[in-house]
Amino acid sequence: INIKDQSICDLGSGAGFPGLVLAICFPSTNITLIESNGKKCYFLNLVKEKLNLSNVTVLNTRIEEYAKINREKDSIVTARAVAPLKHLLEYGIPLVKVNGYFIAMKSNIEKEEYNINNYLTKLNIVEKDRIVFNLPFEDSLRTLVKYQKQNQK
């Protein structure tokens, strides 16, 4: 995925991973961090100011509210352990531009995927890539899944 000069939305940013890391690595990329917890937003804004990250916008709102007014705004949307995969897709896919990507990082993705194929068709997305890896120092399995939003049929 070409990240440079794109717009990225990180859902449920928490402490800022991956949103803040992407903002540091790609200063020409606009990053929107969505976080409903005010204390976490305070932290994200503090880091933004200390590191002078002019490409970051921190929004203290719920994903559902943000999604109502920002349809097909971002080239890439990321989410980690914010909600079950089905809900992440439901909230995140409307934010993604056509041909853009939704990237989910989950720990027990196999348990969540048993009934999701019909849902992928309904949302007009296809799985493009999947990377399974162990977190360093934890020996804990994670899966990154990249979905691409398709044109309406």
List where the protein language model places each region.
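Conserved beta-strand signature within the Rossmann-like core of class I S-adenosyl-L-methionine
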Residues: 99-109
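Short gly/pro/ser/thr-enriched loop/turn and capping motifs at secondary-structure boundaries
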Residues: 40, 96, 109-112
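Short glycine-/small-residue-rich Rossmann-like dinucleotide-binding loops
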Residues: 81-82, 107
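Conserved beta-strand segments of alpha/beta enzyme cores
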Residues: 30, 55-57, 101, 126-129
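Helix-to-beta-strand junctions that scaffold the AdoMet/dcAdoMet cofactor pocket
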Residues: 26, 96-98
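Short glycine-rich, flexible loops that bind phosphorylated cofactors or substrates
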Residues: 85-87
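Conserved SAM/SAH cofactor-binding pocket of Class I
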Residues: 1-80, 89-90
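Active-site capping/gating segments
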Residues: 32, 108-153
